[in-house]
């Protein structure tokens, strides 16, 4: 399971550290957060101590209503659990008992000036991105008519050359050769280029090209969701290719199924144009219209009418 240090979280989200506990060894391994209202009330059954703890205005005000002895006992018990860190929102003052118990058990206390809702949203989004399962695949990733298209195929089949033609047609390059893919939450696969080759594309016979310099910033995109996979393969006369489009094929990446279309490569076929059409067709399907199914329905209706004559 992936994890990050509390120190990295603190630096990346510009949080204020309120005690000097070493944060490099404190690890965060879940994207979920916990507001410990029940624990401050003395109920510790099912305490999600492995999560980041968030103290907002409600929890802070509740602590103020407790007498010193009770407040210290509740905080002492909460901090005795192995929590990764505790974050106080809205720039609220830190109760002295909280700092004392945090130092006693070596727990990191951070503070943010954002309101609690925005803080929780920001931390969850950050953790989902940082802790997301990741894989690197060989291919080209582009944004075509707003559809994230991952073009795959064996080396030398023409993926990069096709990408250049698509860029000339106004589409956006995300990554060439190596595509870093993250699973964000349960429904999204997001792809980007490794930092070292970002905006670059390799064309055999020419070399490395800087797409941003050659075509402008309007030809690139940092990252995109992956909606469709186009697999390029050499034409095989012994193989039967789908000519109607009724069969939906998928490829599984990081546990998610992504729609896949196989395009056979043959001289005189305009692959860039075919990929554009595939992207448009995919978008049309997602909007509820399936051309192949419509054709099949018409055909079946025609056959039924003829059989009744």
From Swiss-Prot:
UniProt-listed Gene3D superfamilies: HprK N-terminal domain-like (3.40.1390.20), P-loop containing nucleotide triphosphate hydrolases (3.40.50.300)
Alphabetic keyword roster: ATP-binding, Carbohydrate metabolism, Kinase, Magnesium, Metal-binding, Multifunctional enzyme, Nucleotide-binding, Serine/threonine-protein kinase, Transferase
CDD domains according to UniProt: HprK_C
Enzymatic reactions: [HPr protein]-L-serine + ATP = [HPr protein]-O-phospho-L-serine + ADP + H(+); [HPr protein]-O-phospho-L-serine + phosphate + H(+) = [HPr protein]-L-serine + diphosphate
Binding, Mg(2+): 160, 202
EC number assigned by the record: 2.7.11.-, 2.7.4.-
Enzyme class, spelled out: transferase
Family as reported in the entry's similarity comment: Belongs to the HPrK/P family.
Protein name, as recorded: HPr kinase/phosphorylase
Originating gene: hprK
């Amino acid at each position: 399971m992936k994890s990050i240090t509390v120190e990295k979280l603190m630096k990346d989200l510009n949080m204020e550290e309120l005690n000097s506990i070493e944060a490099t060894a404190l690890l965060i391994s879940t994207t979920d957060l916990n507001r410990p209202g029940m624990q401050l009330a003395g109920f510790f059954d099912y305490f999600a101590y492995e999560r980041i703890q968030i103290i907002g205005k409600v929890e802070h005000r509740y602590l103020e209503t407790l007498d010193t002895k009770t407040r210290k006992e509740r905080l002492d018990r909460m901090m005795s659990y192995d929590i990764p860190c505790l974050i106080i929102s809205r720039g609220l003052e830190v109760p002295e008992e909280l700092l004392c118990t945090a130092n006693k058990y070596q727990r990191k206390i951070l503070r943010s000036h954002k309101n609690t809702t925005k803080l929780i949203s920001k931390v969850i989004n950050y953790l989902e991105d940082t802790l997301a399962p990741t894989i690197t695949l060989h291919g080209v990733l582009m944004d075509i008519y707003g559809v994230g298209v991952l073009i795959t195929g064996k080396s030398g089949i023409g993926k990069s050359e096709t990408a250049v033609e698509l860029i000339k047609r106004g589409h956006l390059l995300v990554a060439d050769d190596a595509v870093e893919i993250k699973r964000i939450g349960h429904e999204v696969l997001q792809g980007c280029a490794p930092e070292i080759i970002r905006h670059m594309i390799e064309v055999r016979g020419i070399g490395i090209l800087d797409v941003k310099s050659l075509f402008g910033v309007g030809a690139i995109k940092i990252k995109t969701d992956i909606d469709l996979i186009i697999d390029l393969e050499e034409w095989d006369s012994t193989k039967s290719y789908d000519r109607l489009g009724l069969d939906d094929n998928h490829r599984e990446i990081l546990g998610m199924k992504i729609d896949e279309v196989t395009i056979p490569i043959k001289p005189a076929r305009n692959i860039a144009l075919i990929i554009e059409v595939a992207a448009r067709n995919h978008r049309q399907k997602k909007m509820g219209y399936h051309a192949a199914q419509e054709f099949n329905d018409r055909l079946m209706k025609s056959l039924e009418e003829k059989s009744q004559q």
